[in-house]
Amino acid sequence: MLLTKEKNGMEIIEERESAVRSYSRSFPTVFEKAKDHLVWDVDGKEYIDFFAGAGSLNYGHNNEKMKTKIMDYVMNDGISHSLDMGTVARAEFLETFNEVILRPRNLDYKVMFPGPTGTNTVESALKIARKVTGRQNIISFTNAFHGMTLGSLSISGNSSIRNGAGVPLTNTISMPYDTFFKNGNAIDYLEQYLEDTGSGVDLPAAMILETVQGEGGINAASFEWLRGIEKLCRRYDILLIIDDVQAGCGRTGTFFSFEPAGIQPDIVCLSKSIGGYGLPLAITLIKPEHDIWEPGEHNGTFRGNNMAIVAATEALSYWKTDDLAKSVQKKSKIIKLRFEQIVEDYPELKATTRGRGFMQGIACGKGKEAYATKICAKAFEKGVIMETSGPSGEVVKFLGALTIDETSLIKGLGILEEATEEVVRQ
C-alpha cells in the first residue's frame, strides 16, 4: 500500500474526505483486511466485528463460497454491467429466490431491481403504492429510518436526518410505533385517526414500517401489533410495506423478519445482505396484482450489478436448510442472556434490553444516554466494533455476522462487558 509513516491514512482521510464522513470518526483507524467476523487494521490489530457493515455482511467478510463464485464469474468474463437486460446471473437468481425463499413460504411476489441501495427499494415501494391506489399520503412510524433520498427522508423519524433534506417533506404522516407509548394502545390510536374524517389524516396509499427499527433504537414490534397493522391495512384498503433492508435476510432468525407474525405484506424492501458479499444490490418484492409499472417507468443505471447477483444467488444456499436459522436462534439466546446480565450488573446505566435475533441492543436510560457512545468507544479500543442507535445514540447495538462461531461471539461479548465496567467505574 502507499501509506508510510510520513503519510498516515487517517490524516489523508481527514484532509481529503468530506466532513460528512461518520464511521471513520467512530472507528478512527485504517482497516486493511477482513475475514468472516474479524477485521484487521494497517497496524495488524484484530477486531471482532459486531457491526457487519450496518447489516450488509450477514454472512461475514469475504465469505469463501461467495468469493469463489464471484472470482469464477469474473475470470470467465461474465457480464458485469447490464442495466436490466437479461443475463444468466439474473435468471439464476430469480429462479433460486423463488424456489428457496418464496415458494416454501407460500409467498407470491414479482421481483423488481430498483437500483443498488436500500433507499432505492424504498423509493420504488412508495411510487408503486401511490400508483396502485391513486392516493398520495403515506403513514410511517415514530423513530423510523428508511434512507437518505427525499422520499425516504419524508418517512423517517429522526429530525436531524430529516432536516438534511433542505426542503419541505410532504405527503406523509408519522404515527406511534408499537413501543412508543408506555401506556396505551398504538393500534387503537391509529385506527381513531383513520376512522375520524375530522382527524386531518388523509386515507393513505400505504403504511411502511420496520419490524425491528435498526437506526431508531432497536425497537422490536410485537407480533400482535404487526398483525393489527395488517388488519387495519386490509380493512381500509391500504397497502402494507415492510422495510426489511436491515432486519431481513436472516438477521432476526428467519429470512424475512415478519415471518413469525404470520403476515403477508403487499410490498417488501430488501437490500444490504441480499447481495450476500457486501456488494450493492436491492430488490423490491411486489404482489403480482400491484405490479402495474409501465416498462421503464422506474429505472436506473446500476440495476444489473451481476457480480452482486452472483453472490446473492450463492447466499441463498444458506436457506436451503434450516441450519443457519437454528444457529442464529441459538446464538441469539446467548446474546440476550449476556445483555440482560450486563443490565443487571450495572444498574448505573438504568438500562433495558431490546430487539430480537442478531439485532439486539442495550438501551441506556434517561439521563444516561451518553454511556452508550462511551461504551462503544471503549469496546473499539479493546478490539470490538459496535455502533450506537436511537434518537439520542442511547443504544449499544449488536449487528454481528450470522455466521460467527459461538466462541468468538462469547469472546466479543466478554470484551463488551469489560468495556462497560471500565466506563461505568471510571
Curated annotation (Swiss-Prot):
Q: Which organism is it from?
A: Sporosarcina pasteurii
GO molecular-function term, one example from the UniProt record = diaminobutyrate-pyruvate transaminase activity
Write the Enzyme Commission number(s) for this entry: 2.6.1.76
Q: Briefly describe its induction.
A: By osmotic stress.
Q: What is this protein called?
A: Diaminobutyrate--2-oxoglutarate transaminase
Q: In which pathway does it act?
A: Amine and polyamine biosynthesis; ectoine biosynthesis; L-ectoine from L-aspartate 4-semialdehyde: step 1/3
What residues bear N6-(pyridoxal phosphate)lysine in this entry?
K272
Q: Name one Pfam family in it.
A: Aminotran_3
Question: Superkingdom of this entry's organism?
Answer: Bacteria
Q: Which gene encodes it?
A: ectB
Q: Which InterPro entries match?
A: Aminotrans_3, Aminotrans_3_PPA_site, Dat, Ectoine_EctB, PyrdxlP-dep_Trfase, PyrdxlP-dep_Trfase_major, PyrdxlP-dep_Trfase_small
